[in-house]
Amino acid sequence: MEKILVMNPGSTSTKIAVYQDETPLFVESIEHSQDELKPFENIIDQYEMRKDLILATMEKNGVHKEDLTAIVSRGGLLPPIKAGAYRVNEDMVWQLTYAPQNEHASNLGAVIANAIATELDIPAYIYDAVTVDELEPLAKVTGLPEMQRKGMGHNLNMRAAAMKYAKEHNKPYSDISVIVAHLGGG
């Protein structure tokens, strides 16, 4: 049986869950107050604090890190990529730590996942990074020839909501057109 740690670091919380196969063992949102985050000059500086809180929350819920078989996190602000899953590697961690496209809490996901996974010798993945860019060429038009719109957004949440809708209506995801709004803290 697989035990997978799932993480979603956001601006005001870190949502985590551990699944045994497809069954959630626990789901928890670790809230971060402004006072708690204030000492950190850059978001990446929150790495140790958030990693420690994730591990402590797992222990509190009776899950030992040694029992994990994989880790999956929300993807951060990488260069533009296609939607889907990517195995975390050192180049990705370097990009998110030292040269992210922008400062964002999602950048912590792959960094934390990689640290825990490396220690345990298990795989770490990201899924649907913020910088998923699958826009049609026309959607990139801004009105200024020298500027193109970039495909960026809360792709993880939006694609999951659209996939859920498709499943509930017994339609292939590729055959639906839906409008999804993300209303979050970031």
Residue ranges and their predicted role:
Residues G10-K15, G76-P79, H182-G186:
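Gly/Ser/Thr-rich loops at beta-strand to alpha-helix junctions
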Residues I4-D45:
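Short glycine-rich, Thr/Ser-proximal phosphate-binding strand/loop in the N-terminal lobe
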Residues P39-I43, W94-Q101, E146-K150:
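Short, basic, glycine/proline-bearing loop/turn elements
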Residues Q46-L53, Q101-G109:
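Glycine-rich anion/phosphate-binding loops
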Residues M58-A105, A129-G143:
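Short beta-strand-loop/turn "lid" adjacent to the catalytic site in phosphate-handling enzymes
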